[in-house]
UniProtKB/Swiss-Prot annotation:
GO terms for molecular function: tRNA (guanine(46)-N7)-methyltransferase activity. The active site is at residue 113. It comes from Synechococcus sp. (strain CC9902). This is tRNA (guanine-N(7)-)-methyltransferase. It catalyses: guanosine(46) in tRNA + S-adenosyl-L-methionine = N(7)-methylguanosine(46) in tRNA + S-adenosyl-L-homocysteine. One of its GO terms (cellular component) is tRNA methyltransferase complex. PROSITE patterns: SAM_MT_TRMB. Its EC number is 2.1.1.33.
Amino acid sequence: MRQHVNPLSRSFQLPLRLPPPSELFTHPEHPIHLDIGCARGRCILDLADRHPNWNHIGVEIRRPLVIPADREALESPHGNVRVLFCNANISLEGWMETLPKDRLQRVSIQFPDPWFKRRHRKRRVLQPRLLMAIASALQPGKDFFIQSDVREVIDPMVALTELSGCFDRPENDAHPWRRTNPLTVPTERERYVMDQQLPVYRVLFRRNHTHQPPIEEFEQHWQEIDNPGNAPTPDA
């Protein structure tokens, strides 16, 4: 059962300092995989064990999930995985800005909380500013992977990412959805959904060479598409 928390609650609006790689990993020079909304962290803990030459960091807004997950991460013999508490839309942008160029090589958002009602748009994890921060931190050719079992959740994520112009799909990837998870390790939610023989909607994007659009224009354009009834009216 998913335990939702409202990311717009006052308690989640304080920016947190996330430690730099040098304070998190035994080999901070290794490439980083960032998993946003990692829940209990089972996926990245398994990935870290299978890929010791990568560093893996999961961020999660539900603190009761973070505490046991990071405790287990700290026991890894490779020193290459951590799970941190934060609101991704408040604290991640500043952290990604401090990373050395090309250090962040993969970002994933897997089965985010299904805020699909119109009035809950601002609670979605993938907001325009976070997407632009991801686009800024990823060098061309690096991966941004998203998946969900709820069409009302994945469709806006795909539309927003495509609207940015900063990402393309791999040339030979299946459309509209990938059949397989490129990470090769399923999340707990993914296992549950597949055991029920229900569909999973997956899209792999790759950062291209397109410059990011100005954030204010991008946010306004997205508002016009995603919630046209409340879009700001240009001055006469």
